[in-house]
């Protein structure tokens, strides 16, 4: 006898007639007049539960099996048999069943068989992994994460763990969470009346990071090809379906690389990850296609078979101005393209993923390489049909004098970036990288439109439960 996951049984890894033990939770129980109960038991290893056929000859049939309800945890031992019913190839003829955990009050169990709205499930984030939709999201999220790590490993990249606590504002936007151990009721003050951060834990102001990029660049300028994959934080007071205060970012950084190089890297990475989901998690994708967004499978298949289009920002603006479509936000050179503009380009004009590049410098960060025209920077966004921007990246400014000029233009103190400037003083090289918002990727793959439903415990304005 062996411990078996539900997924391993369905994959045929246990011969018909072999005895296995499956451990999981009851989804439903159905009793027949013939004295047999049918238990649907799931363990999270795949989308479908396994059916346990439980005869009334079991010693605990009357006093336990017939009292099982949704959510009870069980250990079932039995023989693997071919299932005569439709929908699954194998089931379990149960010879022994142990109840390891009861649901105290089945009438008040929040995850009972009735269907809940996705909004209601957010209030029950500690129990929502037990539902079909959130369980499927979790498996797809894991598949994407593993695929991304695998992709970079196969491409010879080194994973770098960048710090979550920082003194630098990567984006220069100022929307950062402060990290402090000072007594909020009795703050130390300087002679000018300002908060004296010399008395704080780090002896200076410290924040939660908005990006691992700047730290990642230091390792790329020594190890050539690196990537970071970790949580980032934005204190942006946005209560929308597209924003989180805490989210995960994938940020590769490549020495001796140009904007064109990382555009190619972005395309290869996305196609690799999407192929992994199509190969490994089709059961979950079929659920999303049936209940969330009927286009998810077709969209991913189309994505991996499409060549990425490329267009300069200036040309993209021209396309938008001449398309004859009325946008909510008017288009003019110098604006940051909104979601409606991005989606028009990807879905209606190019009908494919598209890389928009060479943006106006005034709407981009200080570290992006200034182009020869003095007006634009070597920046790019990857736009995907169905969602818009999914990746943002750039070639970094490797020239110290130009970097200092950009810091001054954005009213940033270059002394705060002394270590970042050192990279340009000691063996500077052209280098480039991008950032992928991981939750936005999961949203795109699953069709689950609210980003708060694709991360286990969402953090947003006024939302920090669990």
UniProtKB/Swiss-Prot annotation:
Stated family: Belongs to the class-II aminoacyl-tRNA synthetase family.
Record-linked SUPFAM superfamilies: Class II aaRS and biotin synthetases (SSF55681), Nucleic acid-binding proteins (SSF50249)
Documented EC number(s): 6.1.1.22
GO biological process: asparaginyl-tRNA aminoacylation
Signal in keyword set: no
One GO MF term attached to the UniProt entry: nucleic acid binding
Disulfide bonds: none
One Pfam match: tRNA-synt_2
Localization (cell): Cytoplasm
Predominant cellular place of this UniProt entry's protein: cytoplasm
Species in which this protein is naturally found: Shewanella sp. (strain W3-18-1)
Keyword tags: Aminoacyl-tRNA synthetase, ATP-binding, Cytoplasm, Ligase, Nucleotide-binding, Protein biosynthesis
Protein name: Asparagine--tRNA ligase
Recorded name of the encoding gene: asnS
Assembly: Homodimer.
CDD domains attached to this UniProt entry: AsxRS_core, EcAsnRS_like_N
Family annotation (InterPro entries): Aa-tRNA-synt_II (IPR004364), aa-tRNA-synth_II (IPR006195), aa-tRNA-synth_II/BPL/LPL (IPR045864), Asn-tRNA-ligase (IPR004522), Asp/Asn-tRNA-synth_IIb (IPR002312), NA-bd_OB-fold (IPR012340), NA-bd_OB_tRNA (IPR004365)
Domain of life assignment: Bacteria
Reactions this protein catalyses: tRNA(Asn) + L-asparagine + ATP = L-asparaginyl-tRNA(Asn) + AMP + diphosphate + H(+)
Class in the EC hierarchy, top level: ligase
Gene Ontology cellular component terms for the protein in this record: cytoplasm
């Amino acid at each position: 006898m062996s411990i078996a996951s539900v997924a391993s049984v369905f994959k045929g890894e246990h011969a018909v007639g072999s005895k296995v033990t499956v451990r999981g939770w009851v989804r439903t129980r159905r009793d027949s007049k013939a004295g047999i109960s049918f238990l649907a038991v799931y363990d999270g290893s795949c989308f479908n539960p396994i059916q346990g056929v439980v005869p009334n000859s079991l010693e605990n049939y009357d006093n336990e099996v017939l009292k099982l309800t949704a959510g009870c945890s069980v250990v079932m031992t039995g023989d693997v048999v071919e299932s005569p019913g439709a929908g699954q190839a194998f089931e379990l003829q149960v010879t022994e069943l142990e109840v390891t955990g009861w649901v105290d009050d089945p009438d008040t169990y929040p995850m009972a068989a009735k269907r809940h709205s996705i909004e209601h499930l957010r209030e029950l984030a500690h129990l929502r992994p037990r539902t079909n939709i959130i369980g499927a999201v979790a498996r797809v999220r894991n598949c994407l994460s593993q695929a991304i790590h695998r992709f970079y490993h196969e491409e010879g990249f080194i994973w770098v763990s960048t710090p979550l606590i920082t003194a630098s504002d990567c984006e220069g936007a100022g929307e950062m969470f402060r990290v402090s151990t000072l007594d909020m009721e009795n703050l130390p003050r300087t002679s000018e009346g300002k908060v004296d951060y010399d008395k704080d834990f780090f002896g200076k102001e410290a924040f939660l990071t908005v990006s691992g990029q700047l730290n990642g660049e230091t390792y790329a300028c020594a190890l050539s090809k690196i990537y970071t994959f970790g949580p980032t934080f934005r204190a942006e007071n946005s209560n929308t379906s597209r924003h989180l205060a805490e989210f995960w970012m994938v940020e590769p950084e490549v020495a001796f690389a140009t904007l064109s190089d990382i555009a190619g890297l972005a395309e290869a990475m996305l196609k690799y990850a999407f192929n992994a989901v199509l190969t490994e998690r089709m059961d979950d994708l079929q659920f999303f296609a049936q209940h969330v967004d009927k286009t998810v499978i077709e969209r991913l298949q189309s994505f991996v078979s499409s060549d990425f289009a490329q267009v300069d920002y200036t040309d993209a603006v021209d396309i938008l101005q001449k398309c004859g479509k009325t946008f909510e936000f008017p288009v003019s050179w110098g604006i940051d393209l909104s979601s409606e503009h991005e989606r028009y380009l990807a879905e209606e004009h190019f009908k494919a993923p598209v890389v928009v590049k060479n943006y106006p410098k005034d709407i981009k960060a200080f570290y992006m390489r200034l182009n020869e025209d003095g007006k634009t920077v070597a920046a790019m966004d990857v736009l995907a049909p169905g969602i818009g921007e999914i990746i943002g990246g750039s070639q970094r400014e490797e020239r110290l004098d130009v970097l200092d000029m950009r810091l001054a233009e954005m009213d940033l103190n270059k002394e705060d970036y002394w270590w970042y400037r050192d990279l340009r003083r000691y063996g500077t090289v052209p280098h480039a990288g991008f950032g992928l918002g991981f939750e936005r990727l999961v949203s795109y793959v699953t069709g689950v439109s609210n980003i708060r439903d694709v991360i286990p415990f969402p953090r947003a304005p006024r939302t920090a439960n669990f």
